[in-house]
């Protein structure tokens, strides 16, 4: 059996970290790539590099001759949709330019995308979204990245795949798109202040249909797509497999934190939570939590973004099922499991 070696780009994020953990269970050798690096253990080693620095990237990756699979999950945030294109396309380009010439046994490049491909970030879009849906007006960096891989694939011996999850939930700090942490910290602070748990988004977002993607399920789907012949050179929507409304999920979240539920009250978390660092530090001391800087515990801006969706956010996942991926996760159990793990790791009280 040929030994697989994965290069996981964006290794410190929720998606990359869970993917590495899954690859370890499969017996893969893993190289984690991130700006900050990480601690080597077992079959996992880390490389620290700024992917926007082309020369540094070429230098850092020039010796990765053993790589068979590239899993790309890196992301650079910017203030506007247009500004996202250049850095995110450049990082992917730099990685492929560095790895492809030296990794002579390269089999596959996996690209992590999302519902921005369907225009979910712009407003109400056609649901359930299908992988065959026509593109929307640019800019859209996910589309540019996929088109780049499609061009590079022409004449190459490797294949590609693109995974399109909904909002991804998992354990991870300092991540710009981690809704589970947003909810967990918001609920923990509500309890600390002795106030009920209110949904902070738009009233119509409270009753719209939405779905989530568990980070562990996404890791399994990513490896499946990268190693399955019938999944080559195409994109797949990946979700937990169930739908929910915040109006039904919110009371269950409140019950976990032993909180009462009050009617929704629209607010901008990025503004309302901006002055809560002293409260957080006091909670860390009082409850013996892991000393985590307030800036790393939650992305309030991302919470505002998701809680503003006053329209259904749903994708069709029948394509992946037809191709052979049948994993399913109950979203309520996912949320409660993540919150429990956050408690056990002493990240929240």
Segment roles from a protein language model:
Residues 9, 170, 201-208, 236-243, ...:
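Glycine-rich Rossmann NAD(P)(H)-binding loop
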Residues 134-166, 171:
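Active-site Tyr-X1-5-Lys
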Residues 156, 168-186, 216, 224-236, ...:
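Glycine/proline-rich active-site loop of Rossmann-fold NAD(P)-dependent oxidoreductases
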Residues 185-213:
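A conserved pocket-lining segment of Rossmann-fold NAD(P)-dependent short-chain dehydrogenase/reductase
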């Amino acid at each position: 059996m040929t030994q697989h070696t994965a290069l996981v780009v964006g290794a410190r994020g929720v998606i990359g970290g869970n993917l590495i953990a899954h690859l370890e269970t499969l017996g893969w050798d893993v190289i984690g790539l991130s700006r900050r690096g990480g601690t080597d253990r077992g079959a996992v080693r880390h490389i620290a590099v700024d992917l926007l620095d082309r020369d540094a990237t070429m230098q850092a990756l020039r010796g990765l001759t053993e790589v068979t699979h590239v899993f790309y999950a890196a992301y650079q945030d910017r203030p506007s949709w247009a500004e996202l294109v250049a850095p995110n396309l450049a990082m992917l380009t730099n990685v492929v330019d560095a790895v492809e010439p030296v990794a002579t046994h390269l089999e596959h490049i996996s690209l992590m995308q999302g519902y921005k491909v369907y225009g979910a970030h712009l407003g109400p879009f056609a649901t359930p979204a299908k992988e065959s849906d026509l593109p929307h007006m640019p800019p859209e960096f996910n589309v540019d990245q996929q088109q780049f891989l499609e061009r590079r694939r022409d004449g190459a011996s490797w294949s590609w795949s693109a995974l399109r999850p909904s909002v991804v939930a998992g354990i991870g700090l300092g991540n710009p798109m981690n809704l589970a942490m947003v909810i967990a910290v918001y609920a923990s602070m509500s309890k600390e202040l002795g106030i009920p748990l209110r949904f902070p988004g738009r009233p119509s977002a409270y009753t719209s249909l939405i779905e989530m993607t568990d980070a562990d399920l996404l890791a399994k789907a990513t490896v499946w797509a990268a190693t399955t012949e019938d999944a080559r050179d195409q994109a797949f929507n990946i979700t937990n497999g169930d739908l929910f409304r915040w109006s039904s999920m919110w009371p269950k979240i409140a019950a976990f934190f032993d909180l009462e539920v009050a009617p929704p009250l629209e607010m901008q978390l990025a503004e309302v939570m901006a002055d809560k660092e002293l409260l957080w530090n006091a909670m860390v001391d009082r409850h013996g939590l892991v000393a985590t800087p307030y800036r790393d515990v939650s992305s309030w801006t991302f919470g505002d973004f998701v809680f503003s969706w006053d329209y259904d956010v749903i994708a069709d996942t029948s394509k992946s099922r037809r191709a052979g991926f049948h994993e399913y996760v109950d979203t309520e159990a996912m949320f409660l499991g993540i919150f429990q793990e956050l408690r056990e790791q002493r990240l929240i009280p």
